[in-house]
């Protein structure tokens, strides 16, 4: 990200998309990180977090809107990377503003023989789960420089969202396996979905 910011006029801006100054491009990027975290953190602290279906649906909708919006501001490559920066920033903030502080609070309460707040443990667990399921998508985005046919595809934002869903399904299989629950059908589903997506991209490539 530092390299992109340092060469923002070349690596971030695509005048065919939007004619931005280097300063404006950096400002938009940093603003997207802050706003995305505030929105995500607010949702996690709301009652929506108690309804997995509504929470996941809202997060997927926001992922789609953010991905689409970024492709209308930055060049395709940095737009892709920006989604990874946003998710990575949220993961980092989860660890240092929620997970670690809450765990330290619980430890301190235990040392003082005080009853600790169970909501702190639950919040830390939820954020940890979010980070866990985001891992594969972030890794994919980190390597996206090798997939120019995806990065510069007309529907790159939609492809990214679909890969996010597929990668989360794959991650779910490995999470279950870590608990000695073997559900190969989940892994097969993610693999088949990935093959179907790849086939569609190949057929309808730019």
Where are these predicted regions, by residue range?
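Polytopic transmembrane helical bundles with strong interfacial aromatic enrichment
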Residues: 1-205
């Amino acid at each position: 990200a530092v390299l992109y910011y340092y060469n923002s006029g070349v690596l971030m801006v695509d005048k065919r998309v939007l004619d931005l100054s280097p300063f404006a491009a950096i400002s938009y990027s940093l603003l997207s990180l802050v706003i995305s975290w505030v929105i995500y953190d607010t949702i996690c602290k709301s009652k929506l977090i108690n309804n997995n279906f509504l929470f996941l649906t809202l997060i997927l909708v926001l992922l789609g809107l953010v991905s689409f919006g970024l492709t209308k501001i930055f060049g395709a490559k940095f737009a892709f990377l920006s989604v990874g920066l946003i998710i990575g920033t949220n993961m980092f903030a989860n660890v240092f503003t929620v997970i670690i502080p809450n765990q330290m609070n619980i430890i301190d309460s235990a040392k003082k023989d005080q009853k600790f707040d169970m909501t702190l443990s639950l919040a830390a667990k939820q954020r940890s789960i979010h980070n866990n399921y985001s891992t594969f998508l972030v890794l994919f985005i980190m390597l996206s420089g090798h997939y120019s046919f995806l990065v510069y595809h007309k529907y790159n934002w939609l492809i990214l969202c679909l890969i996010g869903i597929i990668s989360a399904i794959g991650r779910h299989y490995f999470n279950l396996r870590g608990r000695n629950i073997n559900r190969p059908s989940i892994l097969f589903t993610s693999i088949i979905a990935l093959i179907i997506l790849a086939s569609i991209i190949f057929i309808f490539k730019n």
